[in-house]
Structure formats: C-alpha cells, structure tokens
Amino acid sequence: MAIKKYKPTSNGRRGMTVLDFSEITTDQPEKSLLAPLKKKAGRNNQGKITVRHQGGGHKRQYRIIDFKRDKDGIPGRVATIEYDPNRSANIALINYADGEKRYILAPKNLKVGMEIMSGPNADIKVGNALPLENIPVGTLVHNIELKPGRGGQLVRAAGTSAQVLGKEGKYVIIRLASGEVRMILGKCRATVGEVGNEQHELVNIGKAGRARWLGIRPTVRGSVMNPVDHPHGGGEGKAPIGRKSPMTPWGKPTLGYKTRKKKNKSDKFIIRRRKK
C-alpha cells in the first residue's frame, strides 16, 4: 500500500501520514469469525498495571485468525483482503472448497481470487503453508511454529520475513528478522512469503490524539517525576540521573542491561544471537 501525506492545514496534520488502504477490498468482516474483545488497559487479573501506556482507544472486535494452517489438502480461494485493528498486518478471508471460511495473515502479493493450500505436498508459492522440512533452502517464510501443531508464533508482524538457511537432521536452520539464526524442528509449519503491509512502519502518527485512538497513552519521563515515583525523579530543575546507569521505574538497570536468563533451555537451539 502507498503512503498518503496530508498538507499542513493544522499543527496536527503537519507531517501526518496514513496508508491509503488500496489493497483492502472490503470493510465488512466475516461475522462468523468475530469474537468480543474486552479492553484490559494494561491491567492483570489483580487490576495492577503490568503494561504501561495502554488504555482507551476505539472499540474493537477480535478477528479469529488461523495460525495453525492445518486444513490439509483442501484448496482455498482468497475472497477478501481486510484491515485488522488488532495487528499491524492485513488479513485475508479464505473460502475453502468444503465451505469453511478462515482468516489468515495476508502475505505480500496475495490477491483476491488466488488459490492457497496447506499440507506437506503443497506447492512452494505465496500463501501456502507446509512443514519447514519440505521448504527449499533460501525461501522466505513467515508465521513459523515453535512446536508442531501449536500454531505460528514467530514472524507475524507487517513486512517481516525469515529465511530458510539449511537443514541439519530433524532441524531446519532459520534466520529471523532480528538477525538471530536458530534451529527449529522440521515438522513445524511455516507459510511461504513475506507478511504484507510492509509500509506500516513508515506511517507517522502525527498527533497525540491519533495515538489515543489506537489505545496508546502518554509516556512520561522519569526525570520529571518525584523521587517516590521514579529513581530519576527529584532534584532542582533539570537534574542529572544521579546514578551510574539509567534505571527502570522499579530500580533495575536499563538501556543495555541484559535481561535474558543466563541458563535458558532454548539457548541450545540458537546458533547466532540477534544483532545488537
């Protein structure tokens, strides 16, 4: 999709950009694949904030997405490409030959009317899902499983892709979007192609109100808080941090401090760590 720029008719419009939604073919989602979505505002089951800067925003309905891609051997045809307010990628409605309808993540270059398939014998073409062991080296993939049958967990955001680098026994070597190279069980499924809507990251929100429509609340710097609220708070005027390294609101070091567990069970599957 192309990016649309506005003329600076006001301070809020100056610099604002939006996607033109030229790929979207309908604004009416499939009702049978909708579920209610209650807002959590970043709170857990105790009512405590566990994720800051969340709350408000436009009311949404959840679109039930097929991350497992387990409908083997039955061809499906792309009926629509739709906007999904719950993720950065677009979604595609698939009408299967047996009458079932499912949503999938819309890969780049997937068009209405194209046919897709799942299963070990599916062709290597955009939108088809098959086990990693059946995908040729060099192929770009997305929606990758970490355990067979669990459903895709990796590489689901707009514009992302991973590459199959090689095969070693029952494992397949994958380079992820972060630069990390890791081994994943060959029985795990992935979808061929890159995730669509790749220009999503280039959109400039433009004004605070638009962020609030998206459910994003303001981010307040620790240095302008009181000492009771943040380790950076207090002092007269623009005071320095007063510590040897920046801290989180809970007093833990941040900005470069490693938070990954020293003895993580998945370390044995990582060949090369992500780029810094």
Curated annotation (Swiss-Prot):
Family classification? Belongs to the universal ribosomal protein uL2 family.
What PANTHER family has UniProt attached to this entry?
LARGE RIBOSOMAL SUBUNIT PROTEIN UL2M, RIBOSOMAL PROTEIN L2
Q: Which UniProt keywords apply?
A: Ribonucleoprotein, Ribosomal protein, RNA-binding, rRNA-binding
Q: Which InterPro entries match?
A: NA-bd_OB-fold, Rib_uL2_dom2, Ribosomal_uL2, Ribosomal_uL2_bac/org-type, Ribosomal_uL2_C, Ribosomal_uL2_CS, Ribosomal_uL2_dom3, Ribosomal_uL2_RNA-bd_dom
Q: In its keyword annotation, does this UniProt entry include Zinc? A: no
**Assembly notes:** Part of the 50S ribosomal subunit. Forms a bridge to the 30S subunit in the 70S ribosome.
The record lists the lineage as: Bacteria, Bacillati, Bacillota, Bacilli, Bacillales
List cystine links. none
Q: Name one GO cellular component term.
A: large ribosomal subunit
The free-text function statement in the UniProt record for this protein reads: One of the primary rRNA binding proteins. Required for association of the 30S and 50S subunits to form the 70S ribosome, for tRNA binding and peptide bond formation. It has been suggested to have peptidyltransferase activity; this is somewhat controversial. Makes several contacts with the 16S rRNA in the 70S ribosome.
Compositional bias of kind Basic residues: 258-276
Among the GO biological process terms of this entry, one is: cytoplasmic translation
Q: What is this protein called?
A: Large ribosomal subunit protein uL2
Q: Which organism is it from?
A: Geobacillus thermodenitrificans (strain NG80-2)
Q: Which GO terms describe its molecular function?
A: rRNA binding; structural constituent of ribosome; transferase activity
Task: Write down the PROSITE patterns for this protein, in alphabetical order.
Answer: RIBOSOMAL_L2
* Matching Gene3D superfamilies: 2.30.30.30, Nucleic acid-binding proteins (2.40.50.140), Ribosomal protein L2, domain 3 (4.10.950.10)
In this chain, the stretch annotated as Disordered covers 224-276
Keyword Cytoplasm on entry: no
